[in-house]
Curated annotation (Swiss-Prot):
Tissue specificity comment: High levels are seen in the kidney, gills and uterus.
Residues covered by region (Disordered): 199-269, 305-343
Bias (Basic and acidic residues): 248-262
One annotated GO biological process: regulation of transcription by RNA polymerase II
Gene this protein is translated from: myca
Biased composition regions of type Acidic residues, renumbered to the chain: 217-245
Extra information: Alternative translation initiation from an upstream, in-frame non-ATG (CTG) codon or a downstream ATG start site results in the production of 2 isoforms with distinct N-termini, shown in this entry as isoform 2 and isoform 1, respectively.
UniProt organism field: Danio rerio
Top-level lineage group: Eukaryota
Coiled coil location: none
Residues bearing carbohydrate: T69
Name under which the protein is recorded: Transcriptional regulator Myc-A
Length: 419
């Protein structure tokens, strides 16, 4: 079964047959564990025709180590030939199946490689079989020394680099550096998530033999310091942004609370009814009382008008005292409307009194207390026209009498002068 590697480069091909895998850094390369290819747990591709080995599963961490992890830094080791790959895989797996896990098409990362045999995964921070791992590593290193001697004998087919095997022998003394596990800087990650804590140091018994480890360690420490500083700056920026968001939310909540308080406790509206007495004509009353009604109605109307005006003015003063809210415009409109209604009632009452007085002056409808306004107006018009005609007739008679009197005076004067 072909496994996806955790250290795949960005520039490497994606296909399963040509996937570049750091098999020498995977713990499974030293002590492999496999699963059956079930439908529920088909996490990895497998080669057709390959038999599935048995799955020893006592340790719970053996299941988690097969899960995929975030991509890591590209491999810096030299690319191996197909013959070397076959020999290495047959040594580790004890199987005749050709594994293409060491094929790497990119030559930019073939100058050096990471010198750690432990898998570059944060899951190894909780691995409980450290002693067992050290034992297996020491045994496999011895087998690698023997294999190196066999491979160096055949220079045509085997071109395994001596520094590669030496670095394998010295890799047990090195610990995993956080910059190796998390090779990409935080600014290029798109702020997808915060970097986990670095793995604990696992020191093995094999002493170091290469002098290049000190330089790489110092570079790794510098990279680690830079990453920590960038991480702190990003955390501060995120905290500032969060604080700004909280302030805006609080402001909105305050506004919402003020709106809710205004809606729950609106400003009290002082609404007082103005008692305006509307006096209607008593059509059922006796005709003898028609002359006394206008004066009484006028007195009552004046008293009611004074009372309504006083009440409206008092309501206006009370409203101005109590209403100190944004709804003062509405209250003023209500006061104006109320005053207008009072004045309109007063006008109607005066109009009724005028009709009643006019009806009493017309002889034809003077005794008809149920006469309509239109009838009163028509009869009043006819009465006016008749009065005008009578006036003209009387004026003409007066003029005739004046002339006749003048003639009589002139004749009397002549008679006196004759004597």
């Amino acid at each position: 079964m072909e496994r996806h590697s955790l250290n795949t480069s960005v520039k490497m091909p994606v296909s399963a047959s040509l996937a570049c895998k750091n098999y020498d850094y995977d713990y499974d390369s030293i002590q492999p564990y496999f699963y059956f290819d079930n439908d529920d747990e088909d996490f990895y591709h497998h080669q057709q025709g390959q038999t599935q080995p048995s799955a020893p599963s006592e340790d719970i961490w053996k299941k988690f180590e097969l899960l995929p992890t975030p991509p890591l830094s590209p491999s810096r080791r030299q690319s191996l030939s197909t013959a070397e790959q076959l020999e290495m895989v047959s040594e580790f797996l004890g199987d005749d199946v050709v594994s293409q896990s060491f094929i790497c098409d990119d030559a930019d990362y073939s100058q050096s490689f990471i010198k750690s045999i432990i898998i570059q995964d944060c899951m190894w921070s909780g691995f409980s079989a450290a002693a067992k791992l050290e034992k297996v590593v020491s045994e496999r290193l011895a087998s690698l020394h023997a294999e190196r001697k066999e491979l160096m004998s055949d220079s045509n087919s085997n071109r395994l680099n001596a520094s590669y095997l030496q670095d394998l022998s010295t890799s047990a003394s090195e610990c995993i550096d956080p910059s190796v596990v998390f090779p990409y800087p935080l600014t290029e990650c798109g702020k997808a998530g915060k970097v986990a804590s670095p793995q604990p140091m696992l020191v093995l018994d094999t002493p170091p033999n290469s002098s290049s480890s000190s330089g790489s360690d110092s570079e790794d420490e510098e990279e680690e310091d830079e990453e920590e500083e960038e991480e702190e700056e990003e955390e501060e920026e995120e905290e500032e942004e969060e604080e700004i968001d909280v302030v805006t939310v609080e402001k909105r909540q305050k506004r919402h609370e003020t709106d809710a308080s205004e809606s729950r406790y609106p400003s009290p509206l002082v609404l007082k009814r103005c008692h305006v007495s509307t006096h209607q004509h008593n059509y059922a009353a006796h005709p003898s009382t028609r002359h006394d009604q206008p004066a009484v109605k006028r007195l009552r109307l004046e008293a009611s008008n004074n009372h309504s005006i006083n009440s409206s003015s008092s309501n206006r003063h009370v409203k101005q005292r109590k209403c100190a809210s944004p709804r003062t415009s509405d209250s003023e409109d209500n006061d104006k409307r109320r005053t207008h209604n009072v004045l309109e009632r007063q006008r109607r009452n005066e109009l009724k009194l005028s009709f009643f007085a006019l009806r009493d002056e017309i002889p034809e409808v003077a005794n008809n207390e149920k006469a309509a306004k239109v009838v009163i107006l028509k009869k009043a018009t006819e009465c006016i026209h008749s009065m005008q005609l009578d006036e003209q007739r009387l004026l003409s008679i007066k003029e005739q009498l004046r002339r006749k009197s003048e003639q009589l005076k002139h004749r009397l004067q002549q008679l006196r002068s004759s004597h």
